[in-house]
């Protein structure tokens, strides 16, 4: 749906006859720069067609006569809203616009932002009151001027200098005038306060300046807050009108400069104002000028007055005032029991009766005034703003169910803030720091019923009044024509909109959403001050006001609870799991701001672990951030250590240009390694930078220099064959590119950065993975042994109980035959049992022998480093025996002739960890024949058993040759060649009998 606000034709195309007020209202929505032209007519036609299509006509080319009712209905709705808007004062309009803007999506908000900026520029340049506007803006943020104004208000005594009222605020004529009801004259002269004849005029001045307060101006904000207690007391004494104080409360409750601590202190005085209005409505106090009964409501049967300025008042402000006053008196009527909760404790919509509207409208007599307001006000149900209030009543105000409904400006603003009520009212609970509603969102039907004031005037079908049982009595129709309370107009059907509200905000003033963990099982409350005297209340308020001295300009950041004097013990005990774990989520750190180059300030502060001070930079420009000094940080409440660290980091930001220039020059000349350059880029990528296209001298364009260095580094990695392509350097560089893609400064170059990252990823994949590092021989604690220590035979466990060196086999597949006793085995060579011959160096079988060999036991021969490593080979035997391998083998067989000669077999493939079950008997890798004995294939025998085993055909010639050579070989040379005996003697301590395992 689009608003046809282009020309007069757009507004009058569906409305045949309108009053002058309607025409003027529609004209105010038109642009003020040009008259209707052909271009405007074409644009109007397009807007009308689009609006028709959005209203339910799916065919844009349909007959225009068919779309006439839809256009007429839409234009009537716009006219109704415009008429209501005209009846409100400036504060009411501001609250309405604030609430409606929160329901728009981001594109619409940006469009309105551009429109507002354009209108402000045009009005400031062409308006005749531009000088006065500038003066008001300056005074609104001038603490000296505001302090003088506050002193004048506190020390003022009413006088009769009515001629001094001519210099009061510019909007004084549009506000209600109560001069005839307030003429307490004294003989005192006003002197320097003659410009402010009454306190009411000072409040008018404050009301004009309060919206212009800039967030971060702590001194001015404290002066505004100090005025509230005095103004509320004057309202109770009937010195100033209630409406002015309500409007000031409205601005303060929605102002971005007000923190949650400030709202807690404001709620104390808001409670007193509410009690005063309730007591005045019930007739418990003397009625003042703004609580006189209205002739219209008295004639209608109401027992209480509406409180208009005068019966003949016709201005829009007077009508609005009458509406606010009449709505504030509703609880005093006969049907007061129909609403048991006030505006802070409204029940959710799922717990209401569906026919509540019709039931209230059927009321008569004294209950009519209350029934006319309830149908509109009940649409406030289910409103919980996660960004401004928590589920445990963050404002800490606990009200009873019998409190009255504070309508008007305060009701609307308070409802938008979600000011909590009693402990028994339906709140939301927390799940992992996210608030979840206890009730269903507001349904579309109820939202459509009362989302606008036009719903009480005309239906959706044609704009005619509803003619059924739900139609209000005739004496209430004029009341319904008056604008209802703010909350009833603004807050219908917004429960389902907060998903969009929490994500997008206007002008970054409410971008710091509520992220602290909610206390799901406890309700935070503060002690009630209503039963105490006024002096005690003032003391509590002063303490609460002083609680904002630390980091005052951090407008929306909830402060952590401490044991300071301003925090009450009850709040500390009820704080629950208030740990702020979810306070700095990514969507909070990267807030949306219109200041160029400042969107990434949160990530930079997070990298410095100073993200708790992110609120300090929310409204700063890039240039202002670079000018921050340590003294300034300490003056605003930053701790000494944090201010020193932050000031140093800001000074380093100014040196980024020189650093990038130096890195660029050293990379081009080859004086810097790539890893060093990548490290410098890592330190800069998270810092705030302006976009490349931002105006300014080239030497201050940090983003452009940053991209130049990245280009040099990546080109070097891709093209230079001598560049060290380290996997770690590539990974860090890809991380830098990833952070640059999401940086505000490189948004227009994201595609190029993505392509570059893709090329680097392919290069990283194509790199050869790192191989296992091999230690050289003779280096290290193991003397060059690169094998695992647990496989070293010397480190295996031995049987220490029996005193033997027999290794304990702990594996499941260990051969138990190694542990049995061999005393029963006969042996034909008893002289070998008492000798332990030393191993022969040239026959080192997997480390069983001595010498310089470091090969571990039980290693598989398939590993090339075992037998093929020349550094680990045993020294060769003497030259006289180096070429006698066949003769040596025959001598071995002669020594061990009690072993049978088996056919040569190929060793099976087995895992290296199972080799401890085998004993290999071989002459080395170069032997022509190897005797391999496997379990179960051999028998124990002696010299006489050879004839029974079927020797091979070549066994006899070998034995004969051995007998011939046996006489010439000494016993000393033959004894080391008993390899089988050497193996057995090293593994088992003292053998009486020889054995073999087959």
Curated annotation (Swiss-Prot):
Q: Where is this region: Disordered?
A: 1-45, 50-69, 329-370, 773-892, 943-977
Give the matching CDD domains: SAM_Smaug
Q: Where is the composition biased (Polar residues)?
A: 1-37, 801-822, 854-864
Q: Name one Pfam family in it.
A: PHAT
In alphabetical order, the GO MF annotations are: mRNA binding; translation repressor activity
What are the UniProt keywords, alphabetically?
Cytoplasm, Developmental protein, Phosphoprotein, Repressor, RNA-binding, Translation regulation
Instruction: Name the family the entry cites.
Output: Belongs to the SMAUG family.
What protein name is recorded for this chain? Protein Smaug
**Gene encoding the protein:** smg
């Amino acid at each position: 749906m689009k608003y046809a606000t282009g020309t007069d034709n757009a507004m009058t195309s569906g409305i045949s006859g309108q009053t002058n007020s309607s025409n003027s209202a529609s004209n105010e929505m038109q642009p003020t720069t040009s008259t209707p032209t052909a271009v405007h007519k074409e644009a109007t036609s397009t807007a009308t067609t689009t609006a028709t299509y959005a209203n339910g006509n799916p065919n844009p080319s349909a007959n225009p006569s068919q779309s006439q009712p839809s256009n007429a209905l839409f234009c009537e709705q716009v006219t109704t809203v415009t008429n209501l808007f005209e009846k409100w004062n400036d504060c009411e309009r501001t609250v309405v616009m604030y609430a409606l803007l929160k329901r728009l999506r981001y594109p619409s908000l940006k469009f309105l932002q551009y429109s507002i900026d354009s209108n402000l520029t045009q009005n400031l340049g062409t308006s005749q009151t531009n000088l006065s506007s500038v003066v008001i803006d300056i005074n609104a943020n001038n603490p000296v001027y505001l302090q003088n104004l506050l002193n004048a208000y506190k020390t003022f005594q009413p006088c009769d200098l009515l001629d001094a009222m001519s210099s009061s605020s510019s909007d004084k004529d549009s506000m209600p005038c109560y001069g005839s009801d307030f003429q307490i004259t004294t003989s005192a002269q006003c002197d320097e306060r003659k410009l402010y004849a009454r306190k009411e005029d000072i409040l008018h001045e404050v009301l004009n300046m309060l919206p212009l307060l800039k967030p971060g101006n702590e001194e001015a904000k404290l002066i505004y807050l100090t005025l509230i207690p005095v103004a509320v007391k004057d309202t109770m004494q009937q010195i100033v009108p209630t409406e002015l104080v309500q409007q000031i409360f409205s601005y303060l409750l929605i102002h971005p400069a007000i923190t949650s601590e400030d709202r807690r202190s404001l709620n104390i005085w808001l409670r007193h104002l509410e009690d005063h209005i309730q007591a005045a409505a019930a007739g418990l106090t003397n009625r003042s000028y703004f609580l006189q009964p209205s002739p219209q409501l008295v004639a209608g049967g109401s027992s209480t007055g509406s409180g208009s300025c005068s019966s003949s008042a016709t201005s829009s402000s007077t009508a609005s005032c009458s509406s606010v006053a009449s709505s504030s008196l509703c609880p005093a009527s006969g049907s007061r029991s129909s609403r048991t909760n006030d505006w802070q404790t409204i029940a959710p919509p799922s717990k209401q009766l569906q026919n509540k509207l019709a039931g209230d409208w059927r009321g008569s007599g004294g209950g009519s005034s209350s029934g006319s307001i309830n149908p509109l006000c009940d649409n406030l149900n289910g409103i919980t703003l996660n960004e401004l209030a928590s589920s445990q009543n963050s404002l800490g105000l606990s009200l009873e169910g019998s409190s009255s409904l504070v309508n008007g400006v305060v009701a609307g603003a308070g409802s938008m803030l979600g000011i909590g009520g009693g402990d028994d009212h339906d709140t939301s609970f927390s799940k992992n720091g996210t608030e979840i509603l206890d009730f269903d969102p507001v349904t579309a039907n109820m939202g459509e019923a009362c989302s606008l004031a036009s719903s009480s005037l005309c239906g959706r079908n044609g704009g005619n009044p509803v003619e059924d049982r739900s139609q209000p009595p005739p004496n209430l129709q004029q009341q319904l024509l008056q604008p209802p309370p703010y909350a009833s107009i603004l807050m219908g059907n917004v429960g389902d909109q907060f998903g969009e509200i929490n994500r997008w905000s206007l002008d970054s003033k409410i971008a710091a959403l509520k992220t602290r963990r909610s206390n799901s099982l406890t309700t935070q409350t503060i002690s009630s001050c209503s039963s105490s005297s006024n002096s005690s209340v003032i003391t509590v308020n002063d303490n609460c006001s002083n609680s904002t001295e630390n980091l005052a300009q951090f407008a929306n950041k909830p402060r952590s609870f401490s044991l300071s004097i301003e925090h009450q013990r009850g709040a500390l005990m009820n704080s629950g799991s208030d740990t702020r774990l979810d306070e700095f989520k990514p969507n909070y750190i990267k807030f949306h701001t219109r200041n160029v180059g400042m969107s990434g300030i949160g990530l930079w502060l997070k990298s410095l672990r100073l993200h708790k001070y992110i609120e300090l930079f929310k409204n700063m420009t890039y240039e202002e951030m670079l000018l921050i000094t340590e003294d300034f940080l300490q003056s605003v409440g930053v701790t000494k250590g944090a201010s020193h660290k932050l000031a140093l980091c800001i000074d380093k930001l100014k040196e980024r240009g020189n650093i990038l220039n130096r890195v660029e020059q050293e990379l081009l000349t080859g004086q810097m390694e790539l890893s060093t350059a990548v490290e410098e880029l890592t330190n800069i990528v998270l810092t705030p930078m302006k976009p490349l296209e931002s105006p300014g001298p080239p030497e201050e364009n940090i983003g452009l220099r940053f991209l130049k260095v990245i280009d040099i580094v990546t080109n070097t990695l891709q093209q230079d064959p001598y560049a060290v392509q380290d996997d770690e350097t590539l990974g860090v560089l890809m991380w830098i590119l990833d952070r640059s893609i999401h940086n505000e400064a490189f948004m227009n170059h994201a595609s190029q950065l993505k392509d570059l990252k893709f090329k680097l990823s392919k290069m990283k994949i194509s790199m050869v993975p790192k191989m296992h590092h091999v230690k050289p021989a003779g280096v290290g604690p193991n003397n060059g042994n690169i094998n695992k220590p647990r496989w070293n035979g010397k480190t295996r466990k031995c049987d220490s109980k029996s005193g033997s060196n027999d290794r304990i086999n702990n594996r499941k597949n260990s051969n138990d035959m190694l542990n049995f006793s061999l005393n029963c085995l006969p042996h034909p060579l008893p002289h070998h049992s008492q000798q332990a011959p030393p191993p022969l160096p040239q026959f080192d079988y997997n480390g069983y022998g001595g010498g310089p060999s470091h090969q571990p036991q039980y290693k598989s021969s398939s590993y090339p480093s075992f037998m093929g490593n020349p550094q680990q080979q045993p020294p060769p035997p003497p030259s006289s025996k180096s070429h006698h391998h066949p003769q040596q083998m025959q001598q071995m067989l002669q020594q061990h002739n009690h072993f049978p000669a088996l056919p040569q077999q190929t060793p099976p493939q087995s895992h290296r960890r199972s080799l401890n079950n085998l004993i290999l008997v071989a002459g080395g890798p170069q032997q022509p024949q190897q005797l391999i004995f496997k379990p179960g294939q051999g028998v124990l025998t002696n010299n006489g058993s050879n004839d029974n085993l079927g020797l091979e055909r070549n066994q006899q010639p070998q034995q004969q040759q051995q007998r011939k050579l046996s006489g010439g070989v000494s016993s000393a040379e033959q004894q080391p060649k008993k390899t089988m005996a050497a193996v057995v003697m090293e593994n088992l301590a003292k053998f009486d009998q020889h054995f073999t395992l087959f």
